[in-house]
Amino acid sequence: MATTEAQHSRLPYRAIALDLDGTLTNNAKEVTPLTRETLLKAQADGAHIILASGRPTYGIIPVADSLGLEETGGYILAYNGGKIVDCKTMEELYSNFLPAEVIPMLHQYARSKGYALLGYAGNEIVTEMPDDQYVKEESRINHMNIRKVECLTDHLEAHPTKLLM
């Protein structure tokens, strides 16, 4: 059976899953032009791009946008797979929340040890310790503002997927 040029140009893969930090992005947390061009071609050849990260959804969206995933129908696996989002529709396809009874225990433990604990509320990081170096780094990486709160548990999303200590 003869194979056409068009068949050769199609990738044998239907999906390409990529970790972000240190894999897809460089040290500046950016996708290089060559990588972007390669992934755009892969999408044109029929591959779906899946961005997988421990980052919150909001912190992955700029990378997804830079790769045109809102048009091509890629996916975001945020919070280390705790939330899966269809980039074309922004529909949550899957969510796995922290058990409600664990949140006060984590909060109390962090307070007792003097550790920063952060969570997310929309496009913001919420924390009682906004000057902590790790809170600032999370803000920088994800391009999210930090909001200082008196009591973290009063300001979290209704069903948090991730807290970071």
What feature does the model see in each segment?
Residues 82-165:
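HAD-like small-molecule phosphatases
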Residues 11-13, 46, 73, 114, ...:
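A general structural motif
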Residues 1-20:
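Non-catalytic pre-domain segments flanking phosphatase-related domains
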Residues 74-84:
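A short, structured active-site edge motif that brings together acidic residues
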Residues 39-62, 118-120, 163-165:
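Substrate-recognition element of Asp-dependent hydrolases with the DxDx(T/V) motif
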Residues 56-76:
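Substrate-recognition/cap helix-loop segment adjacent to the acidic, metal-dependent catalytic center
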Residues 27-31:
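Conserved ATPase-coupling elements of RecA-like P-loop NTPase cores
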Residues 34-46, 105, 109:
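Catalytic-core regions built around general acid/base machinery
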